[in-house]
UniProtKB/Swiss-Prot annotation:
GO molecular function: ATP binding; protein serine kinase activity; protein serine/threonine kinase activity
Protein name (Swiss-Prot/TrEMBL): Protein kinase shaggy
Alphabetical list of CDD domains matching this protein: STKc_GSK3 (cd14137)
Keyword Signal among record annotations: no
Tissue spec: Expressed in ovaries and activated eggs (at protein level). Expression is over all the embryo at all stages, no local accumulation is observed.
Species assigned in the record: Drosophila melanogaster (Fruit fly)
GO cellular component terms, A-Z: axon; beta-catenin destruction complex; cell cortex; centrosome; cytoplasm; cytosol; female germline ring canal; fusome
Compartments (UniProt record): Cytoplasm; Nucleus; Cytoplasm, Cytoskeleton, Microtubule organizing center, Centrosome; Cytoplasm, Cell cortex
Length: 514
């Protein structure tokens, strides 16, 4: 990309930014290491600035958004990721405003932020200091794909549950992420904790306020975006999450496409031609267009024979044409596919560590859809009694401070699902490969931290992790893949059907002010 990097994270309205704290960046050397000291503001709580020193800085990603560095805080030794983006002085930074509101165990934490001067006159950069998490779901899945395997079903269950929980939280605040994809799902392979990252495309959606449709990375774009809708809802994230789940089950993207038209072709090959009412719900402007009639492909034939029935059912509830018909993220957490996580048993991962926190719901989380509480909580927590119990109280909910409630086997589950046996996954981890390139064509994703991936560089697989990951793999969009199903000639017919959509929304994120 030529020229200056884009200004950061969708400038917020026309609101004048408050005067920026430019305290200067000081550097010195100690024991042969370069130490940088900045004047920073904590990510949450007080606005009182403080000096923060860090060292061992190295670039781990860059793209149109800016640059991401890994560094180590001098005071604590904690590794952090510093996302540096060009700041337009005229506007507030939307990503910063949103991240300061968020506090959840499945969302990457903003530790500090500070401003620094650029080389050009009046050039100012915003630096977001984020907790560092070593891997992404994308890189772990790619390592399995190298050996023609998919991530074991129990890890898919664990990762997707945490994603839905993070979405339930941000959607309850009216915030839409708008770029859900495997590259933006940070993963600690030691603890199996998943955290949603990169809020550079996120926006608080307001009823009646138009939004840009040219948003979200191509393989994960909801059909209403392809149709050019500008009044969409947080359900676009739900569609994207359904694409992620399907991709993890298949080992490749379910709807690969080289353009907006190709994308819709792939969707129609699986879901069939949308009805007139479904088109109206996505974008009323297209209801009069004549689409060739293509039958839907049975979901059971889209996936491998041994894919758990409950997983396929969940995908079908997520990938609905009609946005309002898509399941909510919290309802997804309560889906039977995740019941195994709620079973009482050993609370350990294959490496012997405790399961990540799955049921430490806050009162706010349990108040999102109170009717789901009995389905969300494991029976042994619902039955907890006495003042120290973890059962929701009549007036709201106690904080359910439990970690996992079952063990996760890296070889998959042997439990039956609606009468059919779940598969035993072949093997556990991909080889801890070498190689450092790894970027593939597709959505033009940038590497760590921005629209293309997350804040992470890879650090090699840890013992007991679901995958041993190659060092330094660049995070770009997943390449190719054959999509699920569709009969002979379906692609041609669907392409004809989408001819009117043509140049609308070819994919890619982060391009405008809305």
């Amino acid at each position: 990309m030529s020229g200056r990097p884009r200004t950061s994270s969708f400038a917020e309205g026309n609101k004048q930014s408050p005067s920026l704290v430019l305290g200067g960046v000081k550097t010195c050397s100690r024991d042969g290491s370069k130490i940088t000291t900045v004047v920073a503001t904590p990510g949450q709580g007080t606005d009182r600035v403080q000096e923060v020193s860090y060292t061992d800085t190295k670039v781990i990603g860059n793209g149109s958004f800016g640059v991401v560095f890994q560094a180590k805080l001098c005071d604590t030794g904690e590794l952090v990721a510093i996302k540096k983006v060009l700041q337009d002085r005229r506007f507030k930074n939307r990503e910063l405003q949103i991240m300061r509101k968020l506090e959840h165990c499945n969302i990457v934490k903003l530790l500090y932020f500070f401003y620094s001067s650029g080389e050009k006159r009046d050039e100012v950069f915003l630096n977001l200091v984020l907790e560092y998490i070593p891997e992404t779901v994308y890189k772990v899945a790619r390592q399995y794909a190298k050996t023609k395997q998919t991530i074991p079903i129990n890890f898919i269950r664990l990762y997707m549950y945490q994603l839905f929980r993070s979405l339930a939280y941000i959607h309850s605040l009216g915030i839409c992420h708008r770029d859900i994809k495997p590259q933006n799902l940070l993963l600690d392979p030691e603890t199996a904790v998943l955290k949603l990252c990169d809020f550079g495309s996120a926006k608080q959606l307001l009823h009646g306020e138009p939004n840009v449709s040219y948003i979200c990375s191509r393989y994960y774009r909801a059909p209403e975006l392809i149709f050019g809708a500008i009044n969409y809802t947080t359900k676009i994230d739900v569609w994207s999450a359904g694409c992620v789940l399907a991709e993890l089950l298949l080992g490749q993207p379910i709807f690969p496409g080289d353009s907006g038209v190709d994308q819709l072709v792939e969707v129609i090959k699986v879901l069939g031609t949308p009805t007139r009412e479904q088109i109206r719900e996505m974008n009323p402007n297209y209801t009069e267009f004549k689409f060739p009639q293509i039958k839907s492909h049975p979901w059971q034939k889209v996936f491998r024979i041994r894919t758990p029935t409950e997983a396929i059912n969940l995908v079908s509830l997520l990938l609905e044409y009609t946005p309002s018909a898509r399941i909510t993220p919290l309802k997804a957490c309560a889906h039977p596919f995740f019941d195994e996580l709620r079973m009482e048993g050993n609370h350990t991962l294959p490496n012997g560590r405790d399961m990540p926190p799955l049921f430490n719901f806050t009162e706010h989380e349990l108040s999102i859809q109170p009717s789901l509480v009995p389905q969300l909580l494991p029976k042994h927590l619902q039955n907890a009694s006495g003042p120290g119990g973890n059962r929701p109280s009549a007036g709201g909910a106690a904080s359910i401070a439990a970690s996992g409630s079952t063990s996760v086997s890296s070889t998959g589950s042997g439990a039956s699902v609606e009468g059919s046996a779940q598969p035993q996954s072949q093997g556990t981890a991909a080889a801890a490969g070498s190689g450092s390139g790894g970027a593939t064509a597709g959505t033009g994703g940038a590497s760590a931290g921005g629209p293309g991936s997350g804040n992470n560089s890879s650090s090699g697989g840890a013992s007991g992790a679901p995958s041993a990951v190659a060092a330094g793999g660049a995070n770009a969009a997943v390449a190719g893949g054959a999509g699920g199903g569709g009969g002979a000639g379906a692609a041609t017919a669907a392409a004809t059907a989408t001819g009117a959509i043509g140049a609308t929304n070819a994919g890619g994120a982060n391009v405008t002010d809305s």
